[in-house]
Amino acid sequence: MKKIATATIATAGFATIAIASGNQAHASEQDNYGYNPNDPTSYSYTYTIDAQGNYHYTWKGNWHPSQLNQDNGYYSYYYYNGYNNYSYNNYNNGYSYNNYSRYNNYSNNNQSYNYNNYNSYNTNSYRTGGLGASYSTSSNNVQVTTTMAPSSNGRSISSGYTSGRNLYTSGQCTYYVFDRVGGKIGSTWGNASNWANAAARAGYTVNNTPKAGAIMQTTQGAYGHVAYVESVNNNGSVRVSEMNYGYGPGVVTSRTISASQAAGYNFIH
């Protein structure tokens, strides 16, 4: 499978990404040297953010997202352009999570989700709340060590109430997960690294047991990371969907995590 290494600066004015090919099964390493003209799969880009929060990219190299080649199935690469608009191209590549649509200024608060068609009806364009992490590892190769937050009972995602507007930074993992659970969690839990503790304090159950509909959380990286648990397989592996995991802000992807790896994550129920 392709091995993807990224080096990003999520909050600054530029970022460099390098793509390297390989068949190793271990986690990919970060390429600190950026674009290599001798590598046909290497590229880099810079971006600027204008006053309206729109991203403007300048590419260098021979590689382009349209060349992305995973192992099988169907994959949609979503290119995030600003905080309110998504443009996307579909590729016959690795995932069945194939349609992400976000409708702004929608007057109804009803939300509808399923694995093949994620629709978020949201009225806000706020850029407050927590960030997520941008990762440089390939799909199934993340080794995580986390400290379990104290377990609490009283509230749950499945029976909770909508807390209101999504105040997390648009395009980040926290923003996606808040919408994915229908807003039935706190909107001011901060960075993803803080979510397990914030959830426990708010009365949600937090443990190391995955369950469909739960939130997977880790403190790994500068800001931590959260993802939505789509399903738990018979062998204990966990299928999650997530935003900003290796492909930049606004990009929704999915992956399967082994049972042994899943045991190192926190799960908010």
Curated annotation (Swiss-Prot):
Residues annotated as signal peptide: 1-27
Superkingdom of origin organism: Bacteria
Xref: Gene3D superfamilies: endopeptidase domain like (from Nostoc punctiforme) (3.90.1720.10)
SUPFAM superfamilies assigned to the protein according to its UniProt record, in alphabetical order: Cysteine proteinases
Predominant subcellular localization, coarse grouping: secreted
Domain Peptidase C51 residue range list: 148-269
Intracellular or extracellular location(s): Secreted
Sequence repeats: 83-85, 88-90, 91-93, 97-99, 103-105, 106-108, 115-117
Key words of the record: Repeat, Secreted, Signal, Virulence
Residue span of region 7 X 3 AA repeats of Y-[NS]-N: 83-115
Record's GO cellular component terms: extracellular region
InterPro entries from the UniProt entry: CHAP_dom (IPR007921), Papain-like_cys_pep_sf (IPR038765)
Function, in words: Not known; immunogenic protein.
Identification of the protein by name: Staphylococcal secretory antigen ssaA2
Species assigned in the record: Staphylococcus aureus (strain MRSA252)
